[in-house]
């Protein structure tokens, strides 16, 4: 064919650029790669050509693949595994550096060794699924590869593969190798970065052209808090950021490339030069501070601002310079070693980072967070000792520039020791701990995508500002009461090391931020993360605060939820997140950072590998998709549950999906000490989950802390408001955090009537109530409610009271009769919707699920309405929150019982209701809601504190089942039968609310032990609205498959069939003529002697209601005298019937006279 001819091939790279090459057809793929290497700026050994889903082999010719006139896709790949140290290092530092435009995290030693994908240096990040109709699997793979290629060295050291799953989704697998890094070199890199930032500050001090607007808050962070390794430049880091990193062509070893002592000398010389430049400004600072106490600027605003700017910049400079010295202080040179000697670290440090170079001049560019970075926070109430050096491979764990240690000697994960009078140190740093990948999907489409930006610079800055201020407050407030309370906790987890260095005599906060990868594609969407929380045994109460702040920072930046684990053994869990426990008292969280490392941390006594599956994605397809993705990032889209390991005495928190992600780290903080808002007569639960879980461990060991760690809800509110306000701003909201949920959803869904009262598919009262709640609550309010804070409910008490008075009572007085009547009318209107909701599932035999739900809803809503209309004290919000959460738990448990314990059936019912009421909502959002609800519901049901026994009194049985149960109870004696009735085992088929309240009155005294407290019910409120919404909506799956005119007919027939009464019990005459075997199975249907049932039937038949309270009537019907009189009346009536009925034959019923004889 064209074997010797010329062919034309188009090569399309991941940056969407196409290049056409005219080459000879007999060329091999290897020759073609060499030909295009200069144009595409990718070395031959890193080119991967893909055509029709197949990778072109180097030894085959282009003609064999028939690529003439076709398009070949080119992606980058890591060098072959057989690459040698010299060649590999040269390749990386050469062409790859040019391709990436220079990365601040590029290390020339990254590929000095070959990587065994089956060894410990290989970590499986996890997988995620995408709908198959989004794009071609090959295109997805290329997009992922493109994203990874832009995040530095680590991005080029990955394998991306895709496969189509059986469920119709595209499985994207990302595999990342770990690279070897020198810890001493990271110290030098860190010192260089800090010195460069210090010089930038000095340059601003020396120059007079700086904008005055920057004097109070420099772009990277506020001056009111201490940050180790934070950005000060507004320009991207230069490619030569690692100036001391020597090339590895001459290396003979396959391990880390350790720096020589001469490199340390250069850095120390630079430190001296920086100090000299800083000296005149130090003198100026001395003079300013000397007169600061009583200085009067006489309205000289310019002079005052200039002095303030000098103080701020000098403070930041000293902080950077101090951290530089700390970073260099652990570098040593062993002169007794054989030359050539190199530097080593005497105290290994697991927390590294380098400055973030913020694009403050380009506010639309989000901050590219590092992959694999970890936020770690440690609290010390006394002197600490360093951890032991890690096993040899643990030196590979920190694959980034370095980090500014917050304290001179205890930068490892500390094990607290004894000491008195030492302050509290809160440290928030970023650590390369877990490899995490954030995903960016660029989808082609004709619709204009809804712009959901990533993390702009001001977002990160505001978060750090908010957290630092709150952390300082917490550290200062709790330092006094925290002294000496954690004695003797070293135990099995104590670490041996250097003598501790006394910290300064006041609480301080050190916050660091990760490095920038300049070529991360923009904009970035949601980011995945892994949370690692480690605690000593028993965990100090100060740990609660640490986890709160750490989790808050982490979850805000990269939404996923935490696995909290407290145990005495070192273990690891991996399920869309990573949980590890150790003997160190720190909590860490993984955010994004290009480098990669092993899962071991300094201070741990055993090794383990943890993997993450926290892969986020940004889909720019349409408003609905972006909204679904955005809500997923806010509410926590990934699943996971972390439990405790046996042998641990602290509380074991079960972490579940579906919680707004960033608040998971706050759960421990809220639980510390006593409950923030304990319910009356409720004891703190043994454990708590969000959403709630059953008690799964012993009581928490937070008693020694007393009230020292119990922080006020105002602090919690302040943190959430500050951070959420910033988040809403980054999502395009206006200034402040006053945007309601309705406004938020309407803005993102581009609709105007989604929550308009009376509009859309809502149903009357409940639709208006939902609109009121969504228009009154903000995102901050929902966070507070999820954690048991009733303040938002208390705030809208006037609106709720007015709404219920107008729409519920129609202006009538809030008497018991009026409230019960309104509840009856309101719930009766829901019968059709309840019937439709359960039309497609199988109900437990003998249970009338429609009447059961209606009776339950009447009782619950009557209680809530009574409380809303009558409560006037400060317990309004607390009690209402409890009623809502308790009602939700009982509703789930009740319906799960009625559905034979099948969670799938209950999930189907709820999702069916969501889809029906979301007919006008974007289908992508609906799909997301249903999948999220399924995930949440599964875990909530697994840990529902309400048991089947506690909801039995709500169950209403069909007529035949009720009769069977009554007869079974009456076989022994009338007393036992009455007892069964009192226990609520067999209410009538259509028991009214008044009758059902009988069981409630009997069990009120016994209900308290089974009720979850406000702590247990946190998180369930989020589903309460969804449960209420079950009563709304019109669409059904089958309705779309039949002609429209048949829909009302079929629906009416369905309701008619459900309302048909069961066949009454067979008569004695009929039973006598049946075969013996069949007669035996049908026996047990005795007479109905229940007075309650008789009165209920009579009232329903006559259409009347009691004039007194239901409880009063119930009590009167259950008096022994009345029951006995009723039994005698029934007996008398039967005797009269037997004597007057001409068809009665005593020979056919020989035993009747024993009960109904004249003398009986």
From Swiss-Prot:
Gly residues bias located where? 85-94
Q: A Gene Ontology biological process annotation?
A: internal peptidyl-lysine acetylation
Pinpoint the Ubiquitin-like domain residues. 7-82
- Residue ranges, compositional bias (Low complexity): 95-110, 223-233, 478-495, 566-614, 699-708
Note the SUPFAM superfamilies from the entry.
Ubiquitin-like (SSF54236)
Where are its TM segments located?
none
Highest taxon of the lineage:
Eukaryota
Q: What is its main location?
A: cytoplasm
Q: Name one GO molecular function term.
A: proteasome binding
Instruction: List compositional bias (Pro residues) regions by residue number.
Output: 677-698
Keywords recorded for this protein, A-Z? Apoptosis, Chaperone, Chromatin regulator, Cytoplasm, Nucleus, Secreted, Transport
Recorded hits in Gene3D superfamilies, A to Z, give: Phosphatidylinositol 3-kinase Catalytic Subunit, Chain A, domain 1 (3.10.20.90)
- Region of interest (Disordered), ranges: 76-114, 206-261, 367-422, 478-547, 563-628, 672-711, 962-1038, 1126-1160
Q: Where in the cell is it found?
A: Cytoplasm, Cytosol; Nucleus; Secreted, Extracellular exosome
Its function?
ATP-independent molecular chaperone preventing the aggregation of misfolded and hydrophobic patches-containing proteins. Functions as part of a cytosolic protein quality control complex, the bag6/bat3 complex, which maintains these client proteins in a soluble state and participates in their proper delivery to the endoplasmic reticulum or alternatively can promote their sorting to the proteasome where they undergo degradation. The bag6/bat3 complex is involved in the post-translational delivery of tail-anchored/type II transmembrane proteins to the endoplasmic reticulum membrane.
Summary of subunit composition and partner proteins = Component of the bag6/bat3 complex.
Q: What name does UniProt use for this protein? A: Large proline-rich protein BAG6
From which source organism is this entry?
Danio rerio
Gene name of the encoded protein: Bag6
């Amino acid at each position: 064919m064209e074997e010797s001819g010329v062919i034309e091939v188009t090569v399309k790279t991941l940056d969407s650029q196409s290049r056409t090459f005219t080459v000879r057809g007999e060329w091999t793929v290897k020759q073609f790669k060499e030909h295009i290497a200069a144009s595409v700026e990718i070395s031959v050994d890193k080119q991967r050509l893909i055509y029709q889903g197949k990778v072109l082999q180097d030894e085959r010719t282009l003609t064999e693949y028939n690529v003439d006139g076709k398009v070949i896709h080119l992606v980058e790949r890591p060098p072959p595994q057989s690459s040698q140290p010299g060649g590999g290092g040269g390749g990386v530092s050469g062409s790859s550096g040019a391709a990436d435009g220079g990365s601040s995290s590029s290390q020339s030693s990254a590929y000095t060794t070959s990587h065994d994908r089956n060894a410990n240096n290989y970590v499986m990040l996890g997988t995620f699924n995408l709908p198959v109709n989004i794009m071609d699997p090959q295109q997805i793979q290329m997009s992922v590869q493109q994203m990874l290629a832009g995040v530095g060295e680590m991005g080029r050291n990955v394998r991306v593969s895709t496969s189509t799953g059986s469920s119709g989704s595209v499985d994207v697998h990302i595999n990342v190798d770990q690279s070897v890094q020198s810890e001493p070199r990271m110290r030098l890199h860190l010192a260089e970065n800090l010195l460069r930032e210090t010089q930038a500050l000095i340059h601003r001090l020396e120059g007079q052209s700086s904008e005055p607007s920057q004097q109070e808050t420099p772009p990277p962070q506020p001056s009111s808090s201490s940050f180790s390794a934070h950005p000060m430049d507004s320009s991207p880091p230069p490619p030569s950021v690692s100036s001391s990193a020597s090339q590895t062509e001459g290396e003979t070893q396959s391990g880390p490339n350790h720096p020589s002592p001469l490199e340390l000398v250069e850095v120390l010389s630079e430190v001296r030069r920086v100090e000299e430049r800083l000296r005149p400004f130090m003198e100026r600072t001395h003079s300013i501070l000397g007169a600061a106490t009583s200085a009067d600027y006489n309205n000289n605003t310019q002079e005052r601002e200039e002095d303030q700017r000098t103080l701020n910049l000098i403070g930041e400079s000293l902080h950077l310079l101090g951290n530089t010295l700390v970073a260099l202080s652990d570098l040593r040179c062993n002169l007794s070693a054989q030359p050539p000697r190199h530097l080593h670290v005497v105290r290994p440090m697991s927390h590294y980072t380098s400055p973030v170079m913020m694009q403050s001049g380009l506010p639309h560019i989000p901050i590219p967070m590092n992959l694999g970075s970890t936020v770690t926070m440690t609290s010390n109430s006394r002197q600490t000792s360093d951890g032991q050096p890690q096993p040899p491979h643990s030196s590979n764990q920190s694959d980034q520039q370095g980090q500014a240690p917050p304290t001179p000697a205890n930068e490892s994960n500390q094990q607290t020791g004894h000491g008195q009078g030492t302050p509290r140190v809160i440290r928030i740093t970023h650590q390369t701990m877990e490899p995490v990948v954030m995903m960016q999907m660029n989808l082609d489409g004709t619709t204009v995508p809804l712009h959901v930006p990533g993390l702009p610079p001001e977002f990160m800055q505001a978060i750090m500002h908010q957290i630092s201020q709150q952390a300082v407050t917490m550290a200062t407030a709790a330092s006094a009461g925290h002294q000496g309370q954690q004695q003797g906790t070293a135990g099995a987890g104590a670490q041996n090391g250097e003598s501790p260095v006394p910290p300064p005599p006041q609480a301080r906060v050190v916050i660091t931020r990760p490095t920038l990868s300049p070529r991360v594609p923009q904009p970035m969407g949601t980011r995945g993360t892994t949370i690692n929380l480690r605690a000593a045994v028993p965990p100090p109460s100060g740990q609660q605060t640490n986890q709160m702040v750490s989790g808050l920072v982490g979850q805000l930046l990269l939404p996923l939820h935490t696995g909290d684990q407290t145990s005495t053994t070192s273990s690891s869990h991996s399920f869309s997140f990573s949980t590890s426990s150790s003997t160190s008292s720190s909590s860490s969280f993984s955010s994004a950072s290009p480098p990669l490392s092993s899962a071991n941390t300094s201070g741990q006594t055993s090794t383990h590998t943890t993997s993450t599956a926290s892969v986020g994605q940004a889909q720019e397809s349409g408003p609905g998709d972006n909204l679904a993705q955005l809500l997923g990032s806010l509410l926590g889209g990934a699943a996971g549950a972390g439990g405790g390991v046996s042998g641990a005495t602290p509380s074991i928190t079960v972490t579940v999906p579906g919680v707004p992600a960033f608040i998971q780290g706050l759960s421990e903080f809220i639980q510390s000490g006593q409950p923030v808002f304990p319910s009356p007569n409720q004891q703190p639960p043994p454990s708590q989950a969000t959403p709630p879980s059953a008690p799964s461990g012993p009581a928490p060991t937070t008693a020694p802390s007393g009230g020292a760690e119990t922080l006020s809800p105002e602090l919690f509110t302040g943190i959430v408001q500050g951070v959420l306000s910033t988040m809403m701003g980054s999502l395009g909201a206006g200034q402040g955090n006053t945007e309601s949920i309705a406004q938020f959803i309407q803005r993102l869904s581009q609709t105007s009537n989604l929550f308009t009262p009376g509009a859309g598919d809502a149903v009357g009262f409940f639709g208006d109530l939902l609109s009121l709640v969504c228009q009154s609550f903000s995102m901050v309010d929902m966070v507070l409610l999820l954690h048991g804070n009733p303040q938002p409910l208390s705030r809208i008490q006037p609106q709720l009271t007015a709404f219920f008075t107008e729409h519920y009572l129609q202006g009538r007085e809030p008497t018991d009769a009026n409230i019960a009547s309104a509840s009856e009318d309101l719930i009766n209107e829901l019968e059709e919707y309840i019937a439709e909701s359960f039309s497609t599932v199988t109900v437990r035999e003998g249970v009338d699920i429609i009447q059961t739900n209606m009776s339950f809803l009447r009782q619950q809503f009557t209680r809530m309405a009574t409380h809303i209309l009558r409560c006037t004290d400060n317990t309004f919000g607390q009690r209402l929150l409890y009623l809502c959460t308790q009602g939700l738990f009982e509703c789930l448990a009740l319906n799960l019982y009625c559905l034979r314990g099948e969670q799938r059936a209950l999930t189907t019912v709820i999702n069916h209701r969501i889809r029906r009421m979301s007919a006008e909502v974007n289908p992508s959002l609906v799909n997301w809601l249903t999948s999220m609800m399924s995930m949440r519901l599964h875990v909530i049901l697994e840990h529902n504190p309400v048991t089947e026994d506690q909801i039995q009194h709500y169950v209403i049985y069909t007529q035949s089942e009720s009769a069977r149960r009554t007869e079974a109870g009456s076989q022994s004696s009338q007393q036992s039968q009455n007892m069964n009735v009192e226990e609520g085992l067999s209410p009538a088929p259509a028991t009214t609310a008044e009758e059902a309240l009988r069981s409630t009155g009997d069990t009120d005294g016994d209900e308290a032990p089974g009720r979850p407290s406000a702590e247990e019910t946190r998180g369930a409120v989020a589903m309460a609205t969804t449960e209420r919404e079950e009563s709304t909506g019109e669409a059904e799956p089958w309705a779309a498959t039949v002609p429209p005119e048949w829909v009302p007919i079929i629906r009416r027939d369905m309701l008619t069939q459900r309302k048909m009464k069961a066949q009454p019990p067979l008569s004695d005459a009929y039973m006598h003529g049946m075969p013996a075997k069949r007669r035996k199975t049908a026996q047990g249907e005795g007479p109905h002697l229940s007075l309650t049932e008789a009165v209920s039937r009579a009232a329903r038949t006559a259409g009347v209601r009691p004039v007194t309270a239901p409880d009063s009537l119930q009590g009167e019907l259950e008096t022994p005298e009345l029951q006995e009189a009723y039994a005698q009346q029934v007996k008398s009536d039967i005797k009269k019937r037997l004597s007057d009925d001409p068809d009665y034959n005593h020979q056919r019923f020989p035993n009747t006279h024993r009960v109904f004889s004249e003398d009986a």
